[in-house]
Amino acid sequence: MEKSSIYGLTWTKLTEWLEAHGQKKFRATQVWDWLYRKRVKTFEEMSNVPKETIELLTANFVMNTLEEQVVQESTDGTTKYLFKLSDGNLIETVMMKQEYGLSVCVTTQVGCNIGCTFCASGLLKKSRDLTAGEIVEQIMNVQHYLDGRNLEERVSHVVVMGIGEPFDNYDNVMDFLRVINHDKGLAIGARHITVSTSGLAPRIIDFANEDFQVNLAISLHAPNNELRTSIMRINKTYSIEKLMEAIHYYVNKTNRRITFEYIMLKGVNDHKKEALELAALLGEHRHLAYVNLIPYNPVDEHIDYERSTKEDVLAFYDTLKKNGINCVIRREHGTDIDAACGQLRSKQIKRVGVRERMKQKQAALEE
């Protein structure tokens, strides 16, 4: 039987599991203290936990299902990690240094099926969801990386915007949030956590009904159905009308601000016409709408797309502001490394594929 990651258990699930296996309820407090406060890397280091409990945990769980493969460090402090999972799949995690602290962007799926035509993440289709433990471990690996360098820094913010669609892996993502937000866990404040979705309308409604104060971001990227469908396949299933119905429910239920992500593609969605359409689309909820204009990171496989000029981005920004929409032009991170989400993973898989083909050719020649 393959053991699962101990990091995948929420506080409630760990407590229930320990009690079901004859352990005292307070053992959960001890175990989580070792995992998230002292941040040990083996069960054996949990010195105040009885041997019987240690043996039970060791027999059923592991603490390291991720193996570090590549680390890229940018001159601006951004660090990109490529991890290998226990089944050999590769995922990316990114740490960004912000004025307000350290932010980590986590991956939730191996590959992506959303079908955004400009994105590196979808170059390889989804093969499976990540477990809650595999998502939490991304944060823990980054934190261990910081601890190992005696930097005395901690991950203070989390964005669920890496490879995959978080709401397509809903239950595992919710457990991940419960772990990192819990005051006995990583204790990352809910207002410091943002979950991004490409627009799974039913799950936006589910998310509104959760007991979280976590921020929500919508990957919108176009203000009308024709344009959005041409660059985001998901719009065929959940049109802008369906998406806005879900957003209306979310806003009325939570009264929380929503960030709308809008990637700027030269000659595609960056005209004044689209800016005016976007302002009109968000007009009803402009007091809780916040638009994040994102400079495009070119992807080798998507040669049809280029980043908008600075002049066009500024003009788009000005049009939104003049029409009462709060917005910002996102600061770029890691431009001197594989900046686009999924790009490092895609390149690594290609390299491995090339090496394997060369090995096969060499073997054939030697036969």
Swiss-Prot record:
GO cellular component terms attached to this protein's record: cytoplasm
Domain Radical SAM core, chain residue ranges per copy: 98-326
Cofactor: [4Fe-4S] cluster
Binding annotation for [4Fe-4S] cluster: 112, 116, 119
Active site feature: 92 (proton acceptor), 341 (s-methylcysteine intermediate)
Catalysed conversion reaction: adenosine(2503) in 23S rRNA + 2 reduced [2Fe-2S]-[ferredoxin] + 2 S-adenosyl-L-methionine = 2-methyladenosine(2503) in 23S rRNA + 5'-deoxyadenosine + L-methionine + 2 oxidized [2Fe-2S]-[ferredoxin] + S-adenosyl-L-homocysteine; adenosine(37) in tRNA + 2 reduced [2Fe-2S]-[ferredoxin] + 2 S-adenosyl-L-methionine = 2-methyladenosine(37) in tRNA + 5'-deoxyadenosine + L-methionine + 2 oxidized [2Fe-2S]-[ferredoxin] + S-adenosyl-L-homocysteine
Pfam families: Radical_SAM, RlmN_N
Compartments in which it is found: Cytoplasm
One MF annotation (Gene Ontology) recorded for this entry: tRNA (adenine(37)-C2)-methyltransferase activity
Primary localisation category: cytoplasm
Keyword Iron-sulfur (UniProt): yes
UniProt xrefs under Gene3D superfamilies: 1.10.150.530, Aldolase class I
Taxonomy, superkingdom: Bacteria
HAMAP family: RNA_methyltr_RlmN (MF_01849)
Its biological purpose: Specifically methylates position 2 of adenine 2503 in 23S rRNA and position 2 of adenine 37 in tRNAs.
Family: Belongs to the radical SAM superfamily. RlmN family.
Any further remark recorded for this protein: Reaction proceeds by a ping-pong mechanism involving intermediate methylation of a conserved cysteine residue.
Protein's recorded name: Probable dual-specificity RNA methyltransferase RlmN
Native species: Listeria welshimeri serovar 6b (strain ATCC 35897 / DSM 20650 / CCUG 15529 / CIP 8149 / NCTC 11857 / SLCC 5334 / V8)
Lineage: Bacteria, Bacillati, Bacillota, Bacilli, Bacillales
Gene name, Swiss-Prot/TrEMBL: rlmN
